[in-house]
């Protein structure tokens, strides 16, 4: 997997985990999903203002959020040649927002960032949570991956990936 990490235009946003760990987590998601094709992923570490602008542009919501995923191609796209790499897309994460959110879920900022990174990568692979059935499937996959990676907590689980049409957790 090829990973590009960008700090966005305002370089004050800093991820609470290392670039090596980000790469390792994304590779764990690909392995869990059985993806063997070479994939390109861009991860942007953004400020609240930067992610608010992206949220407005892509989702029509004028508020900061934790993670936005912008998918490009899927690994099983029949238009890709056998040896052709897949441009999965972009994951935009807002560490300051994620840190505030961590307190609501009684997790550390680093663990919440890990959760959002897995969540964003699964969106690039086609998972969604627009209804309860999709959300349950996505949560089960997230929990399986989180159980396999190192975290600050002895066990880390995901709940509440359901959102209404305004993007608010329900």
Question: How should each PLM-predicted stretch be described?
Answer:
Residues 118, 122-126:
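Short active-site segment of divalent metal-dependent hydrolases/proteases
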Residues 1-113, 125-170:
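An acidic/histidine-cluster motif and surrounding catalytic segment
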């Amino acid at each position: 997997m090829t990973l590009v990490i960008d700090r966005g235009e305002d370089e004050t946003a800093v991820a609470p985990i290392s670039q090596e760990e980000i790469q390792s987590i994304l590779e764990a998601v690909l392995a869990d999903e059985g993806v063997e094709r070479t994939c390109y992923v861009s991860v942007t570490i953004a400020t609240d203002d930067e992610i608010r602008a992206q949220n407005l542009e892509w989702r029509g919501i004028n508020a900061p959020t934790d993670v936005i995923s912008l998918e490009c191609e899927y690994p099983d796209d029949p238009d890709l040649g056998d040896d052709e790499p897949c441009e999965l897309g972009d994951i935009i994460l807002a560490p300051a927002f994620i840190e505030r959110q961590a307190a609501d879920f009684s997790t550390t900022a680093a663990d919440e960032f890990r959760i959002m990174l897995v969540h964003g990568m699964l969106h690039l692979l086609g998972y969604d949570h627009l209804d309860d059935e999709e959300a349950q499937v996505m949560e089960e996959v997230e929990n399986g991956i989180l159980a396999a990676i190192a975290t600050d907590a002895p066990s880390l689980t995901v709940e509440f990936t359901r959102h209404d049409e305004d993007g608010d957790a329900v």
